[in-house]
UniProtKB/Swiss-Prot annotation:
Localization: Nucleus, Nucleolus
Residues annotated as transmembrane: none
Molecular function (Gene Ontology), one example: telomerase RNA binding
InterPro entries, sorted: H/ACA_rnp_Nop10, H/ACA_rnp_Nop10_sf
Entry function: Non-catalytic component of the H/ACA small nucleolar ribonucleoprotein (H/ACA snoRNP), which catalyzes pseudouridylation of rRNA and is required for ribosome biogenesis. This involves the isomerization of uridine such that the ribose is subsequently attached to C5, instead of the normal N1. Pseudouridine ('psi') residues may serve to stabilize the conformation of rRNAs. The H/ACA snoRNP complex also mediates pseudouridylation of other types of RNAs. The H/ACA snoRNP complex mediates pseudouridylation at position 93 in U2 snRNA.
Major localisation: nucleus
UniProt name for this protein: H/ACA ribonucleoprotein complex subunit NOP10
PANTHER family for the chain: H_ACA RIBONUCLEOPROTEIN COMPLEX SUBUNIT 3 (PTHR13305:SF0), RIBOSOME BIOGENESIS PROTEIN NOP10 (PTHR13305)
Pfam families for the chain: Nop10p (PF04135)
Region feature (Disordered): 22-42
């Protein structure tokens, strides 16, 4: 059983253990992706996040 979340009307995370909400919306995993030192695509991910201002300030 994994911790999942969905966003409420204010954009805040609401945590649950269910895979779907009562409205039928699929929840997202609250756990970060596994880290791998052999990550081949980290440069591309960082470049895209910078381009779309998704990196934390």
């Amino acid at each position: 059983m994994h911790l999942m979340y969905t966003l409420d009307n204010e954009g805040k995370r609401v945590y649950t253990l269910k895979k779907m909400t009562e409205e039928g919306e699929i929840t997202k995993s609250a756990h970060p992706a596994r880290f791998s030192p052999d990550d081949k695509y980290s440069r591309q991910r960082v470049t895209l996040k910078k381009r779309y201002n998704l990196l934390p300030q």
